[in-house]
């Protein structure tokens, strides 16, 4: 008899398209499945689902559209794949209503994620951008992973994504701690509180009510995103020297200093032509290029995730 219990949820997002979210999410799901974790990969890119292609699967007949429209449950549309321990839920394909679900439909979907029979871990492949649907899925997870490229535009978009996620999470907290007036003033680009960053906002709450400030900080500290730097060049990878993952470490440091967000580096993935070849062959990377450097790097990311506790908190 299968059991229903809360699975660990890992969300993979990015500040813009083309950073490699689907590469990371699909191969992370496969790596976890290889390690004995009963894994469910959910393509939660509600406007541009394509994880099935990276997995080498035909588009499933049943998708998230059926869940959003209440024709099926998430468990109903989770298909068995050819890969051991891996099930898959396809995103909504060419369905405008499913790409923009209303609040009740979204909450119904969120409640089902993580409560599918016989699943240890759920990996969510998110859409790009800072829409509320994407942010809510990102914040739902026990572990939130942000994929970024070593390029100024990608780094800038990643900062914007994390800042948007911070304020989205704070919007829930404000109702509990009565800080709506502070947030209302702070949302103005030029405001009397001198708030320009999330760190400034927390300081403003401290000034208004130190006790509430401590409680809000404790709540927000649970938002501890992990960073994965993709397509890193040799100088960004290093070989055990001081420059090892320096771009990613600098970004994590900036998140802590300027945004007040305790981001941590989860992994650095090398630029590798094996990715392009695998997509063209419609095969998962770990099957198409099992000895590639990027496959080994993705395996290391999976191992780190299994070794560390989940810091996030799934929304009710």
Language model regions located:
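Walker A/P-loop phosphate-binding motif and the immediately C-terminal alpha-helix
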Residues: 3-45
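Conserved GTP-binding G-domain of TRAFAC-class P-loop NTPases and closely related GTPase folds
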Residues: 222-224, 230-244, 248-255, 270-306
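P-loop/Walker-type NTP enzyme "switch/lid" segment
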Residues: 44-120, 176, 183-196, 206, ...
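Acidic-aromatic/histidine active-site loop/patch
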Residues: 1-9, 302-316
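Hydrophobic residues in beta-strands of the RecA-like P-loop NTPase core, especially within AAA+ ATPase
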Residues: 41-42, 124, 229
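Hydrophobic anchor at the start of a short beta-strand
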Residues: 38-39, 122, 144, 225
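Conserved nucleotide-binding/hydrolysis micro-motifs of P-loop NTPases
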Residues: 46-48, 93-96, 129, 151-154, ...
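Conserved catalytic-core segment of NTP-binding enzymes
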Residues: 127-264
């Amino acid at each position: 008899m299968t059991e229903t219990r809360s699975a660990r949820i890992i969300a993979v997002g990015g500040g813009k398209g083309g950073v490699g979210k689907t590469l990371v999410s699909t191969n992370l799901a496969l790596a976890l499945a290889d390690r004995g974790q009963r894994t469910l990969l959910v393509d939660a890119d509600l406007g541009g689902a394509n994880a099935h292609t990276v997995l080498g699967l035909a588009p499933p007949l049943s998708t998230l559209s059926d869940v959003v429209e209440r024709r099926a449950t998430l468990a109903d549309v989770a298909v068995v794949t050819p890969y051991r321990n891996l099930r898959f839920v396809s995103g909504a394909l060419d369905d405008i209503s499913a790409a923009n679900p209303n609040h009740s439909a979204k909450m119904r979907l969120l409640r089902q994620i993580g409560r599918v029979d016989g699943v240890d871990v759920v990996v969510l492949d998110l859409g790009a951008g800072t829409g509320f649907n994407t942010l809510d899925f990102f914040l739902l997870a026990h572990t939130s992973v942000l994929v970024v490229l070593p390029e100024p535009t990608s780094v800038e978009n990643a900062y914007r994504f994390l800042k948007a996620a911070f304020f989205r999470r704070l919007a829930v907290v404000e109702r509990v701690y009565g800080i709506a007036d502070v947030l209302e003033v702070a949302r103005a680009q030029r405001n009397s509180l001198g708030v320009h960053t999330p760190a400034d906002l927390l300081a403003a709450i401290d000034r208004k009510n130190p006790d509430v400030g401590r409680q809000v900080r404790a709540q927000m500290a649970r938002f501890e995103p992990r960073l994965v730097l993709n397509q890193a060049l040799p100088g960004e990878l290093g070989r055990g020297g001081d420059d090892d993952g320096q771009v990613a470490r600098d970004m994590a440091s900036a998140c802590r200093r300027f945004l007040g967000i305790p981001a941590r580096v989860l992994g650095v993935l090398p630029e590798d032509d094996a990715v392009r070849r695998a997509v063209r062959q419609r095969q998962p990377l770990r099957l198409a290029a099992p000895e590639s450097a990027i496959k080994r790097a993705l395996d290391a990311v999976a191992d780190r995730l299994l070794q560390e506790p989940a810091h996030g908190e799934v929304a009710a």
